[in-house]
Amino acid sequence: MEGTAESQTPDLRDVEGKVGRKTPEGLLRGLRGECDLGTSGDVLLPGASSTGHGLGDKIMALRMELAYLRAIDVKILQQLVTLNEGIEAVRWLLEERGTLTSHCSSLTSSQYSLTGGSPERSRRGSWDSLPDTSSTDRLDSVSIGSFLDTVAPRELDEQGHPGPSCPEIDWAKVIPSEDRARTEVDMTSTKLGSLTATWKLPGDGLQCGPPEPSEDDSAKQGFEAHWYWGQCQDDVTFL
């Protein structure tokens, strides 16, 4: 019993450190065997007579039961120590998890600050940065465009620098609407007059008159002249 009490003493000290309360002195004495379990009634109970041997046996039995109760108390304390260790382990895990979460959040915020956008934008940017192996047409167009860009300046150098091109004149802005209408009518009449020019047969020296236009050609020419004149009238009316 004394060896058991001595082996249980370190656990009790650990319990005192975990719980923060001192172990009762009566429990310590019962574990260390400081109380003598004598056989004489005088030692166990000084006021008792020597003839009360049966009463001494009862007192010794009570003290044995008290020692057993103390041992049970020790077991309860050991269970409390085990429970306390489990609680400490769970608290340590929660603290570590909180530390990891804060560290991950700081890393994520720094990543967002570097990308300068929202999480969806950063994910989209990382997805767009991946090479697209399926879009071969787009890669071909890019390669063809770069090839043309490299070939075009070389051909221009070989051909030489072209002279200054004549600026195109917007006659619609220079000529007023009335003069433009007259110009268009003159152009129409010039076209009609060119049809009446003389022409020569390829084997003969005879001068012949122009072939008479058919009814369809004359109707078409008249329609074109009427269309030009109608358009000129619309322009004048608009002005």
Curated annotation (Swiss-Prot):
GO biological process, one term: positive regulation of cytokine production
Keyword set, alphabetical order: Cytoplasm, Leucine-rich repeat, Phosphoprotein, Repeat
Chief location of this protein within or outside the cell: cytoplasm
GO cellular component: actomyosin; cytoplasm
Signal peptide from the UniProt entry: none
Pfam families xref list: LURAP (PF14854)
Positions where Phosphoserine occurs in the chain: 118, 126, 129
Post-translational modification: Phosphorylated.
UniProt feature, compositional bias: Low complexity: 107-118
Record flagged with keyword Repeat: yes
Subunit composition and interactions: Forms a tripartite complex with CDC42BPA/CDC42BPB and MYO18A acting as an adapter connecting both. Its binding to CDC42BPA/CDC42BPB results in their activation by abolition of their negative autoregulation. Interacts with CDC42BPA and CDC42BPB.
Protein name as catalogued: Leucine rich adaptor protein 1
Organism: Rattus norvegicus (Rat)
